[in-house]
A protein has these predicted regions:
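Short, solvent-exposed amphipathic alpha-helical segments in soluble enzyme
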Residues: 135-137, 158-162, 186, 221-228, ...
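Acidic/glycine-enriched edge-of-secondary-structure segments
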Residues: 1-2, 23, 142-144, 148-150, ...
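Conserved acidic residues
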Residues: 23, 167, 290, 318, ...
Length: 422
């Protein structure tokens, strides 16, 4: 789904697919830009197997049920008559069609005397995220999905195989426009130092974060830092979908090696549930020092992070720390572009306030750096490279970067809705 759109406009054009024309659907991971349209596609292609990793088989229903609830709310809030795009019954029916694959173990699909072999590999982007190798009639196609090669605190980096020479490589390009200026561990240390300074001056540190993967990763980071006394002890508040997913992360961590996470972290950090239902930035007073770890990561309206942020901007003791990508059109993206003492408006509350709190950005992305992707392509030696999952400027960086390799392999920068032979 297109995260910048609402309603039917957010969906891919599934009408280009003939009825009953798909043999299988491979879900790479559970973020809604990949997962959100699956119930609709699955209904249109009832014969298709739905292939997922084991963690994804547990997480996807929770993500879709939350998406259903959000759409029900937005139906009236934003006057979107077609919402919800799917029902809870659709989610249950889809879950029954999930076929969970183990990482690194090939799975064969046969049809009309032909056989395709499919293998999932851990992609490191988020728990359950998969890259996909398709082997068919002597050819190999590798789809990275959203991928991260470096280790996180809760998750190992991608375990992609060495396949050179490869026939087709489908590459994500999310960070094509982003040049890394600091190593991940250095960014984590900088975040912890900012938290510590905020707490020591009696302030509140808000960390807006994506519910799936990012909140759980930050809980592990906070726990590890607290063990080493890198920031003063203080109340830590969490809420929303990120906390609802904790039990599933814990269960997966107990039964597999897919994730380094235990819900015992919540007790050791003395995590408190944020129970405030009504927030009025003009009258609500929050007590510091404290840390708030809340979704959404882009500070979208009507989310816990947005509501808490509205109460923090007026005090220079406070900090708001963004740890992932914020689309420029979202409140988070707009706040990052706002200068100190410049007025920022919280549209949900019709409330404007000069920015006096510290606003900082930390590069803790779940996507691989462009240079890492560049080196990955060179190592795999594909005959054809297909660029996906990135804005046009991001994909153009890769197009230009590989110009010198044009004699070695073809680079395809596809247009939406156009069919290509690879």
């Amino acid at each position: 789904m297109d995260p910048k759109q609402l309603g039917n406009k957010a969906l891919p054009n599934f009408d280009v697919l003939e009825p009953n024309s798909i043999d299988f659907i491979a879900l790479t991971h559970c973020h809604l830009d990949h997962l959100g349209g699956l119930p609709i596609l699955a209904k249109k292609q009832p014969q298709a197997q739905v292939l997922v990793s084991y963690p994804t088989s547990l997480l996807a229903p929770l993500m879709l049920e939350n998406s259903y609830s959000v759409m029900c709310r937005q139906k009236d809030e934003k006057s979107i008559p077609e919402y919800p795009l799917f029902t809870k019954e659709d989610v249950s029916a889809l879950q029954k069609r999930f076929f969970a694959l183990k990482f690194g173990k090939p799975y064969c699909i046969e049809k009309d005397g032909h056989q395709a072999r499919l293998t999932f590999f851990a992609a490191g982007h988020v728990l359950g995220a998969s890259s996909l190798l398709i082997e068919y009639e002597g050819r190999q196609i590798f789809i990275t999905g959203d991928i991260l090669f470096s280790d996180q605190n809760s998750l190992k980096g991608a375990q992609a195989p060495q396949l050179a020479p490869l026939d087709v490589l489908v590459l994500e390009t999310t960070r094509g426009c982003t040049e890394r200026t600091a190593l991940r561990r250095a960014e984590e240390e900088r975040l912890i130092k900012t938290i510590s300074k905020t707490i020591k001056r009696g302030g509140i540190c808000l960390i807006p974060a994506f519910a799936l993967g990012r909140i759980q990763e930050l809980l592990v980071l906070l726990y590890n830092a607290r063990k080493e006394n890198k920031y003063p002890e203080c109340p830590i508040y969490c809420s929303g979908l990120g906390m609802a997913l904790v039990s599933t992360f814990d269960a997966i961590g107990k039964t597999t090696s897919a994730v380094n996470f235990s819900r015992q972290i919540l007790k050791k950090l003395n995590i408190k549930q944020l129970r405030r239902k009504k927030i009025d930035p003009k009258t609500t007073k929050l007590k510091g020092p404290a840390i708030y770890l809340l979704s959404s990561g882009m500070l979208v309206e009507h989310t816990p992070a947005y509501k808490i942020a509205s109460c923090l901007l007026k005090d220079n003791k406070n900090s708001i720390c963004f740890v992932g990508y914020c689309d420029p059109s979202t409140p988070g993206g707009q706040l990052l572009q706002t200068q100190p003492n410049e007025v920022f408006k919280f549209e949900e509350f019709d409330y404007s306030i000069p920015v006096r709190s510290k606003i900082e950005k930390f590069d803790l992305s779940g996507h691989a750096d462009r240079e890492d992707l560049y080196q990955f392509v060179l190592a795999q030696k594909p005959k054809k490279l297909v660029l996906t999952h990135g804005d046009e400027d991001a994909r153009q960086w890769f197009v230009q970067k590989f110009e010198d390799h044009s004699k070695s392999f073809d680079v395809l920068n596809p247009n939406v809705g156009q069919r290509y032979e690879v």
